[in-house]
């Protein structure tokens, strides 16, 4: 389907909703930033906002600098290879919402017939993607649906999506429960939720001594002013905590897939409406 404007096609426009009232609305009801809908709603007076904002600002700097990808194109290609088993295992098709999807790298693994939207609070990421990342990910050379929004207030109509995808983002949101309630709302009744993230203690629930020592060292270094060692995540759930979060918000977890590269430390949980 051709894009109606640079960042939204007719399908995406047809399912827009006010992120607060959830009432259907049009592009004209939103503020536009650099051609992109800005539907971001922040809980500035709610506990945790200041910590979230500090972490979000740090993440945005890292995202555009390519931090953690010293080998450039090859590092991004390795990332693709590490993620491939996930999407070989889960058949993500249909109408897809990628929450915290940034520049839409999930598209690298999707069927071309699927309809896709990414939402993310970092609107500027669209214009500041590292060139090495664009070279590695074929999908980044193609246009896609993008809206500036946060996970806690999704600007789409209820029951609009077959899949809601949440990869490496639930430990970055201010209110995880609200993010999952919104995922529940926008999913079709037979839709699926996929949550992927590092869990504290991994599959066994016990943090290895080496990891524990590293975490303590990083905490000490951040306390003495070395900001590059500061942990900017908003929380660190165990596998049990993550399952509880999912089920407490109306879902039934049906399958857990442990990403091979991360050796039982990163899990992808498939869930459906209970």
Give the ranges of each region predicted by the language model:
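Class I SAM-dependent methyltransferase SAM/SAH-binding core
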Residues: 97-153
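Conserved class I S-adenosyl-L-methionine
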Residues: 193-221
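A conserved beta-strand element that flanks and buttresses the S-adenosyl-L-methionine
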Residues: 165
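Conserved alpha-helix/loop element of class I SAM-dependent methyltransferases that forms part
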Residues: 72-94
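Core SAM-dependent methyltransferase catalytic element
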Residues: 244-274
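N-terminal, positively charged/glycine-rich alpha-helical extensions of SAM-dependent methyltransferases
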Residues: 2-67
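A short glycine-rich, Lys/Arg-flanked "PGG" loop and its adjoining helix->strand segment in the class I
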Residues: 177-192
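Short alpha-helix
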Residues: 230-249
């Amino acid at each position: 389907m051709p894009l109606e404007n640079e960042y939204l096609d007719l399908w995406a426009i047809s399912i827009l909703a006010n992120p607060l009232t959830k009432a259907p609305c049009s592009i004209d009801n939103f503020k536009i930033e650099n051609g992109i809908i800005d539907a971001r709603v922040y809980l500035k007076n709610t506990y945790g906002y200041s910590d979230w904002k500090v972490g979000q600002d740090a993440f945005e700097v890292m995202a555009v600098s390519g931090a953690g990808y010293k080998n450039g194109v090859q590092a991004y290609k390795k990332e693709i290879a590490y993620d491939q088993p996930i999407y070989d295992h889960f058949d993500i098709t249909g109408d897809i919402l990628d929450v915290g999807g940034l520049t839409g790298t999930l598209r690298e693994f999707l069927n071309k017939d699927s309809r896709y939207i990414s939402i993310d609070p970092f609107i500027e990421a669209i214009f500041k993607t590292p060139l090495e990342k664009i070279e590695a990910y074929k999908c980044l050379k193609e246009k896609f649906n993008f809206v500036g929004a946060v996970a806690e207030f999704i600007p789409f109509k209820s029951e609009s999506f077959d899949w809601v995808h949440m990869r490496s983002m639930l430990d970055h949101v201010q209110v995880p429960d609200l993010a999952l309630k919104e995922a529940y709302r926008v999913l079709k009744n037979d839709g699926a939720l996929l949550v992927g993230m590092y869990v504290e203690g991994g599959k066994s629930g016990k943090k290895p001594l080496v990891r524990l020592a590293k975490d303590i060292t990083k905490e000490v270094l951040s306390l003495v002013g070395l900001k590059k060692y500061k942990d900017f995540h908003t929380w660190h759930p165990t596998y049990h905590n993550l399952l509880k979060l999912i089920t407490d918000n109306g879902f039934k977890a049906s399958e857990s897939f442990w990403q091979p590269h991360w050796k039982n430390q990163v899990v992808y949980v498939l869930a459906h409406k209970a």
